[in-house]
């Protein structure tokens, strides 16, 4: 195929997205340069249906030409990639507008500047629909009725006087770059709500998973008491509005990930494996939970991740029995204690990669050896886990995964020799006795799958149970496919013997 034909093909591929097609205006600037190129063009064209249906043709015809690269074409490719990424976020907002067609989805950027954190951490939902990681305090409004999105930016962004330029400024340039209809100063927010105040409009929002009420109930909107403080003021000023919590519905929109998201999750998972193995090696009698946590955090950074995706849990003894670990969020010491011989540790860790979360865990004996009763029960627990993991695939429900887990658990009823194992099997075979047993999604945040599992979703299979003050837990990350599930966290021990060997290294 000739050079001109290849250029025409590239133009056709890119014009599969109207937004990406506009970027072709820069290509004539580099007409005289050799087409040696760069695989980023594949990303720039990913919005094209033709490309999605003819991936191999695109790779063999075009990418073959763009193999070595030259600077001008690299500039062009980066520009095209930026446009394609903006188109991705626009597509996400379109899906949100369709989902919330009867109202307005409001997503608030993080406002907290925490000097004790490793950096600014953006609200995951705001980031998913904008891609803005350093924009503080902004508000995104996705109007389902008009099918338009508004980004309201603070008039005085933080540290502007100190020379820190905001990630994005209000105006037409930002609207073009972000593929957003309106990027304006938040002084216009009042007029935006006033223009909708004559209608009975639902204002959808997402509550934080671990946020506590900031005001007493008698000061909150009676129709939407669970709404955040900033929303309470809006509901008070315009009573026709009704706030509706929509966290699960937003998570469902995020559940099936793009190629780029899956790549980030693979990296998060890989670094999390390294962090967990480091944590296993740090568990010793007399050590503090804090000392293990610090080893895990350091291992995430050493593996190339952006630290931990959540502060590690190295919960020993009673601290590992649910729901006790949750109380660590409200404690200055994070339930820190000294690890005691004979106890089991819930080692639950995750590393963050490009905002995406890893999550992985094992039950670890403080003494570096399970006692005979613990060993028998752990062996049964692992067998049940593996039976549940085998049925993971698109179309399977969480109840079906539990049934497979329970069936294998009960199969060991007659062969179990210890009282601990026999009583555990009897108790755990009833769903009501293992209320924290779960399958959850993992991406920018964690969520609960809605309906059957879908291909392209990253999930964590995480049975959680306890007996006699001992917590048992096992967790891996999986990418759901049509035919099964790909384990994203290989290389971590399962058996008692393998865990003990890892502790001895």
Residue ranges of model-derived segments:
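Low-complexity, intrinsically disordered or signal/transmembrane-proximal segments
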Residues: 12-15, 59
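N-terminal amphipathic/hydrophobic targeting modules at extreme N-termini
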Residues: 6, 10, 46-47
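Active-site neighborhoods and metal-handling regions in enzymes and metal-associated proteins
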Residues: 52-54, 58-66, 82-505
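Short, Lys/Arg-enriched N-terminal segments with co-localized hydrophobic residues
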Residues: 40-51
């Amino acid at each position: 195929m000739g050079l001109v034909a290849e250029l025409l093909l590239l133009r056709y591929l890119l014009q599969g997205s109207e937004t990406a097609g506009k970027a072709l205006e820069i290509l004539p600037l580099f007409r005289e340069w050799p087409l040696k190129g760069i695989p980023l063009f594949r990303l720039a064209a990913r919005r094209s249906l033709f490309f999605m249906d003819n991936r191999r043709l695109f790779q063999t015809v075009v990418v073959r030409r763009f193999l070595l690269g030259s600077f001008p074409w690299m500039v062009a490719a980066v520009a095209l990639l930026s446009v394609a990424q903006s188109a991705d976020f626009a597509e996400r907002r379109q899906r949100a507008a369709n989902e919330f067609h009867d109202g307005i989805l409001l997503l608030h950027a993080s406002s907290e500047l925490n000097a004790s954190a490793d950096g600014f951490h953006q609200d995951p939902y705001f980031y998913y629909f904008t891609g803005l990681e350093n924009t503080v305090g902004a508000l995104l409004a996705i109007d389902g009725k008009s099918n338009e999105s508004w980004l309201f930016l603070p008039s005085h962004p933080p540290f502007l006087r100190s020379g820190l330029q905001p990630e994005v400024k209000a105006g037409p340039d930002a609207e073009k770059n972000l593929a957003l209809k309106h990027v304006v100063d938040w002084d216009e927010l009042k007029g935006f709500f006033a223009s909708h105040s004559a209608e009975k409009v639902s204002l959808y929002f997402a509550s934080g998973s671990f946020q506590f009420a900031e005001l007493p109930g008698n000061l909150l909107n009676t129709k939407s008491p669970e709404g955040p403080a900033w929303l309470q003021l809006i509901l008070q000023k315009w009573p026709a509005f009704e706030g509706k919590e929509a966290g699960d519905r937003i998570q469902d929109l995020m559940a099936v990930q793009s190629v780029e998201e899956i790549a980030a999750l693979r990296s998060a998972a890989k670094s999390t494996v390294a962090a967990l193995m480091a944590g296993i090696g740090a568990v010793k009698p007399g050590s503090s939970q804090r000392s293990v946590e610090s080893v895990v955090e350091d291992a995430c950074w050493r593996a190339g991740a952006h630290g931990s995706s959540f502060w590690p849990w190295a919960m020993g003894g009673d601290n590992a029995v649910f729901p006790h670990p949750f109380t660590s969020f409200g404690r200055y010491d994070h339930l820190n204690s000294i690890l005691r011989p004979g106890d089991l540790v819930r080692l639950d860790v995750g590393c963050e990669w490009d905002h995406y979360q890893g999550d992985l865990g094992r039950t670890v004996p403080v003494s570096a050896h399970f006692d005979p009763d613990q060993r028998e029960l752990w062996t049964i627990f692992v067998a049940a886990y593996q039976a549940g993991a085998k049925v993971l695939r698109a179309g399977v429900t969480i109840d079906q995964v539990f049934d497979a887990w329970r069936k294998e658990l009960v199969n060991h009823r007659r062969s179990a020799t210890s009282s601990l194992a026999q009583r555990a099997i009897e108790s755990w075979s009833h769903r009501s006795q293992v209320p924290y047993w779960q399958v959850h999604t993992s991406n920018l945040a964690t969520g609960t799958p809605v309906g059957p599992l879908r291909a392209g979703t990253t999930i964590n299979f995480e049975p959680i149970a306890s007996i006699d003050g001992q917590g048992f837990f096992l967790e891996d990350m999986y990418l759901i496919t049509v035919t099964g599930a790909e384990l994203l966290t290989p290389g971590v021990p399962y058996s008692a013997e393998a865990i003990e060997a890892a502790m001895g290294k």
